[in-house]
């Protein structure tokens, strides 16, 4: 009976420790990016590319930049200084990628 009780106590302690570890890791994972609000890239890029002569190309580049930077400058052109990450992304050829 004593062996059964000892085994049961050890299993209970092991279960509690495992559960605690899972909760700690879940709490750490939920804090990653805490305070960062994701913007609506589709809506922002639709407005940004509304006057583009090549809207599909503009939307593809804008969405790519938005997902990477979580920022799209206001207006249909310019204003890159308001979103430094967006303004710093370039193509392999060295040209600005983001519209």
Swiss-Prot record:
Q: What is its main location?
A: secreted
Location in the cell reads: Secreted
Q: Which organism is it from?
A: Arabidopsis thaliana
Could you state one GO biological process linked to this protein? gibberellic acid mediated signaling pathway
Function in brief: Gibberellin-regulated protein that may function in hormonal controlled steps of development such as seed germination, flowering and seed maturation.
Q: Which UniProt keywords apply?
A: Disulfide bond, Gibberellin signaling pathway, Secreted, Signal
Q: State the taxonomy lineage.
A: Eukaryota, Viridiplantae, Streptophyta, Embryophyta, Tracheophyta
What is this protein called in UniProt?
Answer: Gibberellin-regulated protein 3
Q: Which InterPro entries match?
A: GASA (IPR003854)
Give tissue specificity per the record: Expressed in siliques, dry seeds and vasculature of roots and rosette leaves.
Look up the record and report any one GO term of the cellular component aspect: extracellular region
Q: Which PANTHER family match?
A: EXTENSIN, PROLINE-RICH PROTEIN (PTHR23201), GIBBERELLIN-REGULATED PROTEIN 2-RELATED (PTHR23201:SF18)
Similarity comment: Belongs to the GASA family.
UniProt key word Secreted? yes
- Signal peptide (from-to): 1-26
One Pfam family name is: GASA
Q: How is it modified after translation?
A: Six disulfide bonds may be present.
């Amino acid at each position: 009976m004593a062996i059964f009780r000892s085994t049961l106590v050890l299993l209970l302690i092991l279960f509690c420790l495992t559960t605690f570890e899972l909760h700690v890791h879940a709490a750490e994972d939920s804090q990653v990016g805490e305070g960062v609000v994701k913007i609506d890239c589709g809506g922002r890029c639709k407005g940004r590319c509304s006057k583009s002569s090549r809207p599909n190309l503009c939307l593809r580049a804008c969405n790519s930049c938005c997902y990477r930077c979580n920022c799209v400058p206001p207006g249909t052109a310019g204003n890159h200084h308001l979103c430094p990450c967006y303004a710093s992304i370039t193509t392999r050829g060295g040209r600005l990628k983001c519209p």
